[in-house]
């Protein structure tokens, strides 16, 4: 199962990329603990460990690809070894950055929950962070 969502963020693509690959910036935007690096292969943890995974592909100013799962701190963590793949594609637009989220390999029972969560936990906080 998969999710596709798009939004506009009022910031250059490089700034959005930096936020998605920096624990301190991501935490500042979301208000929740985050451990993220800008190195491919590194593990990450966001939202206080509710979501965790690994940085698969990082292309500055263009895209972030992650192996993604609900972690041990989530009320309903995924089974060990179960991961989905999320791709955050960044494209320049007149308003700043078009953020395209493609999330694949999601267990069917989680599609609606995750789809509804992206605006709350990603798009809205990023939009607010860059509007200040």
Where are these regions (language model features)?
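Hydrophobic ligand-binding cavity/cleft-lining segments
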Residues: 1-35
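Short, conserved loop/turn and helix-capping segments at secondary-structure boundaries
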Residues: 20, 80-81, 115-116, 120
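A conserved amphipathic terminal alpha-helix motif
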Residues: 105-132
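Hydrophobic beta-strand positions in extracellular immunoglobulin-like domains
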Residues: 9, 103-105
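Residues that scaffold the ATP/ADP-binding catalytic core of kinase and kinase-like folds
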Residues: 19, 29, 67, 109, ...
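Hydrophobic-ligand binding "helix-grip"
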Residues: 27-31, 35-38, 45, 49-96, ...
């Amino acid at each position: 199962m998969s999710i596709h969502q798009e939004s506009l963020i009022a910031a250059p693509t490089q700034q959005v990329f930096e936020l998605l690959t920096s624990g301190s910036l991501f935490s500042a935007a979301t208000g929740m603990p985050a451990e993220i690096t800008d190195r491919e292969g590194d593990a990450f943890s966001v939202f206080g460990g509710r979501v965790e995974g690994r940085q698969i592909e990082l292309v500055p100013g263009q895209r972030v690809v992650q192996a993604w799962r609900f972690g041990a701190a989530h009320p309903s963590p995924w089974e060990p070894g179960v991961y989905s793949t999320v791709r955050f594609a960044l494209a320049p637009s007149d308003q700043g950055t078009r953020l395209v989220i493609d999330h694949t390999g999601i267990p069917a029972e989680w599609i609606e929950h995750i789809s509804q969560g992206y605006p709350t936990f990603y798009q809205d906080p990023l939009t607010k962070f860059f509007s200040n």
